[in-house]
């Protein structure tokens, strides 16, 4: 009978040990599953962050390229000098000056904008020239500067050399033929204009 009881106790203990083993296995499995889930969540979070960073970098690169292209286009539109190496802020300031200059020219009605292409481009060259000379009178960034705005007659006395490899950068020279064909009073007037820094 004792043997029978002992075998019962032993088998009962085995069952207890087995149930403890089963529980510990289940706990280990659950821990492993939760660890796997955490690792999986961590990996997916890392992948999301990397993807988000890559997309943000692409957007920033595209924004920078668009901005640079816009500034490049603006530099081609505004008259510049061969010596200009303009930063972005200087380009914006120069564009603002050019807009102000054009506003004054339009207000005074100094340039006749004809519908003919040849006249339009001639007027555009004269405006570019006048702006560049106006810009060189005194301090480039001075607010209280009193600028001379050219009359159409003064603009007509100028000749332009456009250098294609420099975009819209103009190299200027005085209208020699205009000086040669003018009478002495006109020459004196042109020389005075040169001395005053208008051309």
Curated annotation (Swiss-Prot):
<feature type="region of interest" description="Disordered">
    <location>
        <begin position="1"/>
        <end position="43"/>
    </location>
</feature>
<keyword id="KW-0804">Transcription</keyword>
<keyword id="KW-0221">Differentiation</keyword>
<feature type="compositionally biased region" description="Basic and acidic residues">
    <location>
        <begin position="25"/>
        <end position="39"/>
    </location>
</feature>
<keyword id="KW-0539">Nucleus</keyword>
<dbReference type="GO" id="GO:0000981">
    <property type="term" value="F:DNA-binding transcription factor activity, RNA polymerase II-specific"/>
</dbReference>
<dbReference type="GO" id="GO:0046983">
    <property type="term" value="F:protein dimerization activity"/>
</dbReference>
<dbReference type="InterPro" id="IPR011598">
    <property type="entry name" value="bHLH_dom"/>
</dbReference>
<keyword id="KW-0805">Transcription regulation</keyword>
<dbReference type="GO" id="GO:0000977">
    <property type="term" value="F:RNA polymerase II transcription regulatory region sequence-specific DNA binding"/>
</dbReference>
<dbReference type="InterPro" id="IPR050283">
    <property type="entry name" value="E-box_TF_Regulators"/>
</dbReference>
<keyword id="KW-0238">DNA-binding</keyword>
<comment type="function">
    <text>Probable transcription factor, which may be responsible for the formation of myoepithelial cells in early muscle development in larva and the formation of non-muscle tissues in later bud stages and mesoderm-like structures in the medusa.</text>
</comment>
<dbReference type="InterPro" id="IPR036638">
    <property type="entry name" value="HLH_DNA-bd_sf"/>
</dbReference>
<dbReference type="GO" id="GO:0030154">
    <property type="term" value="P:cell differentiation"/>
</dbReference>
<protein>
    <recommendedName>
        <fullName>Twist-related protein</fullName>
    </recommendedName>
</protein>
<comment type="subunit">
    <text>Efficient DNA binding requires dimerization with another bHLH protein. Homodimer.</text>
</comment>
<dbReference type="Pfam" id="PF00010">
    <property type="entry name" value="HLH"/>
</dbReference>
<keyword id="KW-0217">Developmental protein</keyword>
<dbReference type="GO" id="GO:0005634">
    <property type="term" value="C:nucleus"/>
</dbReference>
<feature type="domain" description="bHLH">
    <location>
        <begin position="51"/>
        <end position="102"/>
    </location>
</feature>
